[in-house]
Design a protein with these regions (language model features):
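N-terminal [4Fe-4S]-dependent radical SAM core
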Residues: 1-94, 332-334
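Auxiliary Fe-S-binding modules of radical SAM enzymes
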Residues: 1-32, 222, 230-334
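Hydrophobic faces of well-ordered beta-strands that scaffold small-molecule active sites
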Residues: 32-36, 93-95, 126-128, 152-156, ...
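Structural recognition of alpha->loop->beta junctions
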Residues: 54, 116-123, 210-224, 294-309
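Core AdoMet radical
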Residues: 60-77, 84-107, 122-135, 151-177, ...
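Short amphipathic alpha-helices and their capping/turn segments at secondary-structure boundaries
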Residues: 80-84, 135-149, 209-219, 262
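Acidic (Asp/Glu)-rich catalytic clusters
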Residues: 84-86, 114-121, 141-151, 183-187
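Conserved C-terminal portion of the radical SAM core fold
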Residues: 176-235, 251-276
Length: 334
């Protein structure tokens, strides 16, 4: 089986459906994301569904290093755009509402933040990261209205398709909430990108790979893959120090990502293939802080294995097991 010429042409030589390529084809130039942090929280932090937050989460891991507390959307965009323009001569940006749960507030307040971002010079779209259990109808309608006016991605933090894992990491929601959120978002014709963490204790290789055919069946538009990594001042750090958490080596993770991509519908956009936090707050693995090194290792391994996204789609993907959750949910996605 050879890498199809049609995909080589469409993906400009890459062996997966890269988000950067999609943005460049859409806007005819490189587009950069500017991460934003506002005064939001999460329902598994404030006591609504749990306390303490996810066991792996320290929001400093995705907060800009030069973040100023209580800085406005405009101020954060100015700072981010200035840095990207100086470094890359960037002209176009996506405002990325990234930290905490960016739909967990009153719709009027959310709209103010979103529209403030859209008013910033050079912003060509929005990315809104949230939890699947924090999309009330009013907020979803607001986001759908904005999506008619701008380029927009709704990013849903699922992290695992297995309820036993979601419970262990203290997510405070289940797969059923995610399925409901995806269905309602797709009813509004929204682009949905799902976050998935690979490497949780208790999940086998097959458990992790089962997410690819699961996403195929749901018809999501994008996926972000993260390797499990341990951040300072988290519950996961305590488990790691007790020897209760084993992490992938870079080679192990690279092989898993390629196996995952081979099962994934080639139409699904790969927004990210690995995750990393600032070196100063990363406990392990050390290789994860070298983002470019991890990405290059994936690119080289794809070439070495003569592999590509969707190589075994749909044949092997269709035969993969459904997630081990509720029976009626398994039936719903088959």
């Amino acid at each position: 089986m050879n890498f199809p010429n049609s995909l080589q042409t469409l993906w400009r030589g890459k062996r997966f459906n890269s988000f950067n390529r999609v943005l460049k084809d859409t806007f005819h130039s490189r587009v950069y994301k500017i991460g934003l942090r506002l005064d939001f929280t999460c329902p598994n932090r404030d006591g609504k569904v749990a306390v303490g937050g996810c066991i792996y989460c320290n929001n400093a891991s995705h907060t800009p290093t030069d973040y100023r507390p209580r800085a406005s959307v405009t101020a954060q965009l100015e700072q981010g755009a200035r840095a990207l323009t100086n470094r890359h001569k960037a002209e176009k940006f996506i405002a990325y509402f990234q930290s905490y749960t960016n739909t967990y507030d009153h719709p009027a307040k959310l709209e103010k933040h979103y529209r403030e971002a859209l008013d910033f010079p050079g912003v060509v779209g929005l990315a809104i990261a949230t939890r699947p259990d924090c999309l009330p109808d009013e907020v979803l309608t607001l986001i759908a209205d904005l999506a008619k006016q701008t380029y927009l991605w709704l990013e849903l933090g699922l992290e695992s398709i297995h309820d036993r894992t979601l419970q262990w990491v203290n997510r405070g929601h289940g797969l059923k909430d995610y399925l409901d959120a995806v269905e309602r978002a797709k009813n509004h014709d929204l682009r949905v990108c799902t976050h998935l963490i690979l490497g949780f204790p208790g999940e086998s290789r097959d458990d992790m790979l089962a997410a690819a055919p699961f996403f195929n069946r749901l018809g999501i538009d994008g996926v972000k893959l993260h390797n499990l990594h341990v951040i300072k001042n988290t519950v996961l750090e305590k488990y790691y120090n007790l020897g209760q958490v084993a992490l992938f080596s870079r080679d192990e993770y690279v092989d898993l990502v390629i196996d995952f991509l081979e099962l994934l519908n080639p139409g699904i956009v790969a927004h990210r293939l690995s995750g990393a936090a600032h070196r100063s707050i990363t406990v392990a693995p050390n290789w994860s802080v070298d983002k470019r090194g991890a990405h290059n290792a994936i690119f080289k391994a794809l070439e070495r294995r003569d592999s590509w996204q969707g190589k075994y789609y749909p044949a092997r993907a269709a035969a993969a097991p459904a997630p081990l959750t509720f029976d009626f949910l398994q039936g719903a996605i088959l």
